A protein has these predicted regions:
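ATP-dependent phospho-/nucleotidyl transfer catalytic cores
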Residues: 128-201, 248, 264, 268
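Conserved ATP-binding subdomain of kinase catalytic cores across diverse folds
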Residues: 46-166, 274
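Mobile late-domain/C-terminal helix-loop "cap" segments
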Residues: 251-312, 318
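A residue-level signal for conserved active-site and pocket-lining positions in enzyme catalytic cores
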Residues: 70, 112, 155, 206, ...
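Conserved kinase catalytic-core segment
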Residues: 97-113, 170-237
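Regulatory N- and C-terminal appendages and interdomain linkers associated
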Residues: 1-48, 52-54, 220, 224, ...
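Catalytic-core segments of enzymes that bind and process phosphorylated/nucleotide-bearing substrates
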Residues: 154-177, 214-274
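A glycine-rich phosphate-binding loop feature that marks nucleotide/adenosyl-phosphate handling sites
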Residues: 127-130, 211-217, 283
Length: 319
């Protein structure tokens, strides 16, 4: 049995609470800042209403997942609720349209961490006998009643685009945004390159302009750097009929991507070819670890195999 937060084994000698929750006590403290795993004070009716709102707005993957901002209340019992402020967490439940989205996102985030990509704090929880995905917001620090806010702007905003145009752009545009606004452009450009390579390898065709952001490093200082990665999904596996391999254009295209396209992109970013090849080689060498992560994930066996086959095929293109 593995912890739903850190992914490490829960000892057979662990207390019954850890085994029941499938969370280490230390992981509960790290993620929620509490001694006990919060109970989810969210009803089936609220989840159903969220589903209806999502469908009515036409918000499905690719696009916007069902999600709700939630508050951690410690007044009487430790619980997660949607009625109070401040909302320090985001919860993503299961959907009828696409099965196992929480499990897919959890796997994708864990593989990103294996690749050396910094990710937002995230985990799985059990709710109504199903997995839900939960992430902690990084644009605020909440300590009791004290809240510190950090400015965070996504690339759609920084490019002056409407949300509806989040797929109309290129990764070269993302590089220009970083060069213009980041206080660490060299580091962030290399990180951008790594994330685009990783997105291709794992079938994430949904890394659009709103899924990249710059965030203040110190509240109120306006010292922006590329934020930690979030909203990572292997859409090419979830929706096999999606023919596009990337959300934005790379070297002028979204499909039939080849290794040379990444090299040309690196040159446009000002990344030396040798450095770009080293990054791609590093990601390819992690193939076996990605496959192990798939095997250890909470996806059904068929979905695990589909995920592994995609990684193997994409690695051959990058190799």
């Amino acid at each position: 049995m593995r912890c739903l937060h850190c992914g490490k084994e829960i000892s057979s000698h662990a207390d019954l609470t850890e085994q029941k929750n499938r969370w280490h006590r230390r992981c509960i403290k790290k993620f929620f800042g509490t001694k006990e795993l919060p109970m989810a004070d969210i009803t089936e009716e609220q989840l159903e209403q969220l589903a209806n709102d999502t469908v009515n707005q036409g918000l499905t993957v690719p696009g916007v997942q069902r999600k709700m901002s939630i508050h951690l209340s410690t007044d009487l019992n430790t619980k997660l609720t949607i009625v109070d402020y401040p909302a320090g967490y985001i919860l993503k439940p299961q959907t009828k349209e696409y099965e196992n989205l929480p499990e897919y996102e959890d796997l994708a985030m864990r593989m990103a961490e294996i690749a050396g990509i910094q990710t937002v704090p995230h985990a799985l929880m059990r709710m109504n006998d199903q997995y839900v995905y939960i992430t902690r917001r990084i644009d605020r620090d909440i300590h009791g009643k004290q809240i510190t806010m950090y400015a965070m702007e996504d690339f759609c905003q920084l490019a002056g685009r409407l949300t509806a145009d989040k797929y109309r752009g290129s990764y070269e545009l993302c590089a220009r945004i970083i060069k213009k606004y980041s206080v660490l452009p060299g580091f962030d450009l290399s990180e951008l390159f790594l994330r685009v390579v990783f997105s291709f390898l794992t079938g994430n065709s949904d890394m659009h302009l709103k899924n990249f952001s710059l965030k203040e490093q110190e509240a109120g200082k306006r010292n922006f750097c590329l934020s930690k990665a979030y909203d990572i999904l292997p859409v090419n596996v979830i929706i096999p009929e999606d023919n596009e391999q990337l959300a934005l254009t790379l070297n002028g295209k979204k499909r039939n991507i080849r290794k040379k396209d990444f090299i040309i992109f690196a040159e446009k970013c000002g990344i030396p070819v040798k450095s770009a090849e080293k990054i791609m080689r590093k990601v390819c060498l992690l193939k076996e670890r990605f496959i192990i992560a798939c095997d250890e994930s909470y996806l059904p066996e068929m979905n695990k195999e589909e995920m592994k086959q995609l990684i193997i095929c994409r690695e051959e293109i990058l190799h």
